[in-house]
Amino acid sequence: MYRTGKSDIRIIALCLASFMLAGCNGMFDGIYDEPVRDEALQMGFNPTAQEGRYTLILDARKYDEWIYLDLHRLAIESHPIPATLTGEWDGRSVWARYNVQGSRYTLLEERQVDTQAEPEQWDLALHHFDVRTNGGSVLQTGYTSIDALPQSAANFASEEFRPDEWTRHQCIVDFSGMFDYNIWYQASPVNLVLSDWVRMDFSTPPPKYEASRRVYLLRMLDGTVAALHMKSYMSEAGTKGILTIDVKYPY
């Protein structure tokens, strides 16, 4: 997820304030081609007429949880992000508060927290627009539709799939200091390729959201591959954070 500028943070804060007061309904209407009709929403994996093809609907509006997906079993499980330390520290799990000035992040303070809970089996997880994998790696293709992909993932065997990276200022967990440009983040592994499925441009108001519209390939620990097409971040009624993902597994 792309973020820029001190003035950018001010604009984000104003948008958040507007969101809390009025829900920002309609503010970003028309950005995505295929918003989901609210009355048709069925959270989870919605099977299609094609075998191994699903329309995945997720409510990812919260900033205080990770939503874990098991593509093998078509299972979904949410876990809250720990905000305190209740046991022995694992040596790296922290909340870090940064002052954000453009691309410069100045660490103000950090606090130790419990290790992020995870299911026994999972393949990828989402935190709002941020995405991590369970030891997997991701390739952004040049395709904008799963239907247009080559017949087999073997066609991409020579391409470079990128693994997750440890980040300290990617996953926002607390906006309360936004007006002072002070943001709390959860230190966490993140797949920066897949997390780039939606970019935010705050160079000129109002903020503009742009989806890459690309198809991503997720190579999992067992070597199997899933094709993921991030189609929308809102419902037809303008509810932000309702994600629509076209899934093909196995690919």
Give residue ranges: language-model regions.
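Hydrophobic helical h-region of N-terminal Sec-dependent signal peptides
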Residues: L14-S18
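C-terminal motif of bacterial Sec signal peptides marking the signal peptidase cleavage site
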Residues: M20-G23
